[in-house]
């Protein structure tokens, strides 16, 4: 019988960790590719498949597989989907065009050229996640449906030592690679209307017949990144995290699907933005279920990886929750207007629904609560925040202050604009939201005081050494022209002003990553890192900006050996942390 570690208050006992799963080794072979995918084209990749045994099917399974394939080609693709125009949010010609198109894997390239001077204090690796479909879509495809790929640049001693990009070897990716085509449903791009119902039935039939194995997870791990307890975790909210190791030569190696040593259910999930407390080392997280209750759960892990008991958060319907916030003592959980209604597919619509009758609200819960008895809801009318950048407690007023970007229309990322002209223009307004859990009253205001300076701000961060505490600055992507990112803004949350760094004509990037200088006294003493792509030249680089300088000057740019597609979220792992990897 496995021994158990002593249980801390509110924590479930933890079984002795099993040995780590075997590493995934990837053999590489250079294959030229322009990174473009055409509908129906064969996939192109830089890496050869990992050496792994092929799935062996018995004669009945082979017969079932052939029958299901015939139904897919004849009924679903041939009848339900043929001739149907795709919305822009599900059209591969839009979603993976230009620099959104996927690239192949690349093993470490060493000795990268640098213009300017790299600060010696940047000692570690910058890693950024993103969606990068291995196979050409067979039907609808949304950017968020792509397989997760990590891009990593190793910096040390004022040098850019290496660059590499690798797929996160999810169970889904490995099975689809073996089969040579996509067989798992694409949650946003495919699950619309009757064809979406049909594709869910195809998936269920393949799983039931043993043609594919859904028990090992169905996620793509393409969104968030966090480094906790010696592990870099790649995440998307449709699965458990995946543990990825940065090797000594700057490569990326998938260790496997990570359940925190059996503390998370094998069929469970964790959202893409868990919160790491910089003081205690605890990791706080949510998990939502779109089918059955409890629809939402809250839990946390100690610095050494011991999990708390789940707290069931009472919500009336399955709700899309991509992000949340923590303060020193509380978790702030949004329950907003984007909900899941799977029955809408039967009526020909999308299961991701903007519920105009629902009142947006935020739940305030003690961070280490054992149950939801102390949860307090505060309504915030007309508010949908896809991301929350920080939160803290205002001792003078008793309020919880939340900094987030309020998006309109709320479903802009997922669905086509409505027929209402006033709702067709996308806006993402940086907002200060004040919650009073004692009275249930909220206040909201735009952070940028000058309306003429208002820009769409989405994707970014504060100084993560101050997460959950009051911060003065936030570093956020300027999402203009939407969905491209033309630069980033350093926003002064106190004065309501912003200093902007624009990448230049025809140059676009993504989320800015703020890296504080070791031992810095000033909150903004550090550098902002971001991948930037020149669409005219077809080149990509890692731009380094001095965040503390008056004009936010670019101090260096690392020339990268290949195109880096526009992606999602990133993190910086210091050299000392790399040495302590599990």
Swiss-Prot record:
Gene Ontology CC annotations of this record: chloroplast stroma
Entry's induction text: Induced by abscisic acid (ABA) and salt. Induced by D-allose. Induced by infection with the bacterial pathogen Xanthomonas oryzae pv. oryzae (Xoo). Induced by drought stress.
Transmembrane segments: none
One matching Pfam family: RPE65
UniProt binding sites for Fe cation: 273, 322, 387, 569
Transit peptide feature, positions: 1-64
UniProt region (Disordered), positions on chain: 1-53
Cofactor note (record): Binds 1 Fe(2+) ion per subunit.
GO molecular function: 9-cis-epoxycarotenoid dioxygenase activity; carotenoid dioxygenase activity; metal ion binding
Record keywords: Abscisic acid biosynthesis, Chloroplast, Dioxygenase, Iron, Metal-binding, Oxidoreductase, Plastid, Stress response, Transit peptide
Catalytic activity: a 9-cis-epoxycarotenoid + O2 = a 12'-apo-carotenal + 2-cis,4-trans-xanthoxin; 9-cis-violaxanthin + O2 = (3S,5R,6S)-5,6-epoxy-3-hydroxy-5,6-dihydro-12'-apo-beta-caroten-12'-al + 2-cis,4-trans-xanthoxin; 9'-cis-neoxanthin + O2 = (3S,5R,6R)-3,5-dihydroxy-6,7-didehydro-5,6-dihydro-12'-apo-beta-caroten-12'-al + 2-cis,4-trans-xanthoxin
Subcellular location: Plastid, Chloroplast
Cofactor: Fe(2+)
EC number, as in UniProt: 1.13.11.51
Entries under InterPro entries matching the protein: Carotenoid_Oase
Family: Belongs to the carotenoid oxygenase family.
Function: Has a 11,12(11',12') 9-cis epoxycarotenoid cleavage activity. Catalyzes the first step of abscisic-acid biosynthesis from carotenoids.
Name of the protein in question: 9-cis-epoxycarotenoid dioxygenase NCED4, chloroplastic
Species this protein is from: Oryza sativa subsp. japonica
């Amino acid at each position: 019988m496995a021994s158990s570690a002593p249980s801390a208050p509110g924590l479930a006992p933890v079984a002795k960790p099993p040995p780590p799963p075997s590493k995934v080794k990837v053999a590489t072979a250079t294959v030229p590719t322009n990174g473009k995918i055409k509908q129906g084209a064969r996939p192109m990749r830089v890496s050869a498949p990992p050496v792994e045994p092929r799935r062996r099917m018995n004669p009945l399974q082979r017969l079932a597989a052939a029958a299901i394939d015939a139904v897919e080609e004849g009924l679903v693709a041939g009848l339900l989907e043929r001739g149907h125009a795709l919305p822009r949010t599900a059209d591969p010609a839009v979603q993976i065009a230009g620099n959104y198109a996927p690239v192949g894997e690349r093993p470490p390239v060493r000795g990268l050229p640098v213009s300017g001077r790299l600060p010696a204090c940047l000692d570690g690796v910058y890693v950024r996640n993103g969606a990068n479909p291995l196979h050409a879509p067979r039907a609808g495809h949304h950017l968020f449906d792509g397989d997760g790929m990590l891009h990593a640049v190793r910096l040390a001693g004022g040098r850019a030592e290496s660059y590499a990009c690798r797929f996160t070897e999810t169970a889904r990716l490995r099975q689809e690679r073996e089969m040579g085509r996509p067989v798992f449903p694409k949650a946003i791009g495919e699950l619309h209307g009757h064809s979406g119902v049909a594709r869910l039935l195809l998936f269920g039939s393949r799983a039931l017949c043993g043609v594919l194995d859904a028990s090992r997870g169905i996620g793509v791990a393409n969104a968030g990144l966090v480094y906790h307890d010696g592990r870099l975790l790649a995440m998307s909210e449709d699965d458990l995290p995946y543990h990825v190791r940065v090797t000594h030569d700057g490569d990326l190696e998938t260790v496997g699907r990570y359940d925190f040593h059996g503390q998370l259910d094998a069929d469970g999930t964790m959202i893409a933005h868990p919160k790491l407390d910089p003081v205690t080392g605890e990791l706080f997280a949510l998990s939502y279920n779109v089918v059955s209750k409890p629809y939402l759960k809250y839990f946390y892990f100690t610095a050494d990886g011991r999990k708390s008991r789940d707290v069931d958060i009472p919500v009336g319907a399955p709700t899309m929750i991509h992000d949340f916030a923590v303060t020193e003592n509380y978790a702030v959980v949004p329950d907003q207007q984007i909900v899941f209604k799977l029955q809408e597919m039967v009526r020909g619509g999308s299961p991701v629904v903007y519920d105009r009758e629902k009142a947006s609200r935020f739940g305030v819960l003690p961070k280490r609560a054992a149950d939801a008895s102390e949860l307090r809801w505060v309504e915030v009318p007309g508010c949908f925040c896809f991301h929350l950048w920080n939160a803290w407690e205002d001792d003078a007023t008793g309020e919880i202050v939340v900094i987030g970007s309020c998006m309109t229309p709320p479903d802009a990322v997922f669905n086509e604009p409505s027929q209402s002209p006033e709702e067709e223009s996308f806006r993402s307004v940086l907002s200060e939201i004040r919650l009073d859990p004692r009275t249930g009253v909220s206040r909201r205001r735009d952070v940028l005081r000058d309306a003429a300076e208002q820009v769409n701000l989405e994707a970014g961060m504060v100084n993560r050494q101050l997460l959950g505490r009051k911060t003065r600055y936030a570093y956020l992507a300027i999402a203009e022209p939407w969905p491209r990112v033309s630069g980033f803004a350093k926003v002064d949350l106190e004065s309501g002003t912003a200093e902007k760094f624009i990448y230049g004509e025809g140059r676009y990037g993504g989320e800015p990553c703020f890296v504080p200088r070791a031992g810095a006294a000033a909150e903004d003493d550090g550098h902002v890192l971001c991948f930037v792509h020149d669409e005219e030249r077809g080149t990509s680089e890692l731009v380094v900006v001095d965040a503390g300088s008056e004009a936010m000057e670019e101090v260096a740019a690392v020339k990268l050996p290949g195109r880096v597609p526009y992606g999602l979220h990133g993190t910086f792992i210091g050299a000392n942390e790399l040495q302590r990897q599990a």
